A protein has these predicted regions:
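Alpha-helical interaction/dimerization surfaces of two-component signaling modules
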Residues: 23-27, 45
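Conserved acidic segment of CheY-like receiver
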Residues: 4-15, 20-24
Length: 114
C-alpha cells in the first residue's frame, strides 16, 4: 500500500486555503490533517499532527511565515517539506533561504501542484 502523506495548511485567507484544500484532495495519497488561520494555532497544529507537507502562507495576521519557521525549526524532529504560499512573488528569495521545498503563488494554479 502506498504511503499517505499528511498535509497541514497555515493561511489566514480562508478562500485561498479552501481552494488549495479542494485541489489537494484530488490526490489520493494526500490527507489534509489540519488548517490554521494564524501562526500560534499553526504551531500547535504542527506539534500535534507532525505533517509530511506544510503549506505555509508568508504573511499571517500574528507573524510572518518565516518567523514561524524559525520558531519551530529546532522542534521539527520528523521529515517535513515546506511549501511557502503567497500572493506576492517578492517573497520567493525568503522561501529559498528558509529551506522551503517549493514556492506557490496565489491564486493556486492547479497545474503547479502536479
Amino acid at each position: 500500500m502506498d504511503k499517505l502523506y499528511r498535509v497541514v495548511i497555515i493561511d489566514d485567507d480562508e478562500f485561498s486555503a479552501d481552494n488549495l484544500c479542494l485541489e489537494l484532495k484530488k490526490y489520493n495519497r494526500l490527507s489534509i490533517d489540519g488548517m490554521a488561520r494564524n501562526g500560534v494555532n499553526g504551531r500547535k497544529l504542527l506539534e500535534k499532527v507532525h505533517p509530511d507537507l506544510l503549506f505555509l502562507d508568508v504573511e499571517l495576521p500574528d507573524m510572518k511565515g518565516m518567523e514561524l519557521l524559525e520558531q519551530i525549526r529546532g522542534a521539527i524532529t520528523w521529515n517535513m517539506q515546506i511549501v511557502f504560499y503567497t500572493a506576492y512573488d517578492k517573497y520567493m528569495i525568503y522561501a529559498i533561504r528558509g529551506a522551503a521545498f517549493d514556492y506557490l503563488l496565489k491564486p493556486i494554479d492547479k497545474n503547479c501542484l502536479l
